[in-house]
Amino acid sequence: MISIYAKPPFLRVNEATGDSYVCRVSSRIRGEEISEYMGTKYNAEERAVDDLCIFIKPRSLNSIEDGDYVDVLDGIELIPMLKERPGVKVIAMSQVHYEYLKNELKNEIYLIHHHHINFERFRRTKNDILAGGMIGHSPEAYNTYNQIKESLAPVGIEFLGAFNYKTRQDMIDFFKKIDFFVAWWGDYDRTGFYNHPTKIINPASFGIPALTQPFIGGYKEFDGFYIPIEDMNSLVEEAVKLKDDSYYQIWSDKVFQEAEKYHISQIAELYKQLK
């Protein structure tokens, strides 16, 4: 049986705003949610001889045996340890992540993407007044949100933010309110090996197109399924185009269908293939 081990998520207070937000979300996504959906063990006190063990971003490899799996995520500190333990198997979370790890490690590497949050396959219908939205919890996110909201107001487009979300349901409730999503990266490093497209696949699973600055490799598996922007002017231009119902429907259908590849039922099949 699959047995997943992960450190629990926790809340951290944003000193700039006083709000709390969830850290270590990967434990909930690739630990709790996958375990509950598949009926696997989760943080079991004892391991059986025939358990297939997956450790999500562990601090060390001390308790990990050859043949176990390590889900690296953004744990760059694990790479030197894994080089010393080629018998430990590795899980990558995106295509660019997989390619990087393949180049760095001699270990067996398996690609398993994040599943999206829309287990129920809920489909959005467009608001009468177009509304966009973004998520985040950094001080920069608040500043960006205000800039985008002010830029869209003159063209009659509403803009909402979700900064204090803590549960999957919080995110579902948010996505049910918006027609398009903005992933604004600004000066953020878009070349990192640990980048992945989940941030734009989540809204896509509701039929919500994303406007975003392209990642170098990080969006590789979702290329062609988001609307590229470069600056605030292009963001406004592309958002205005989405007012057209026919144009919007083309994008909504396109991204909704592609996001099905990342439904939890599809991702669970990849876990079942591990040996």
Q: How would you label these PLM feature ranges?
A:
Residues 29, 119, 230-234, 243-275:
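A charged, aromatic-enriched C-terminal amphipathic alpha-helix characteristic of glycosyltransferases
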Residues 72-90, 104:
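Membrane-proximal helix-turn-helix segments that form the acceptor-binding/catalytic region
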Residues 89-100, 106-121:
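Donor nucleotide-sugar binding/catalytic pocket of nucleotide-sugar-dependent glycosyltransferases
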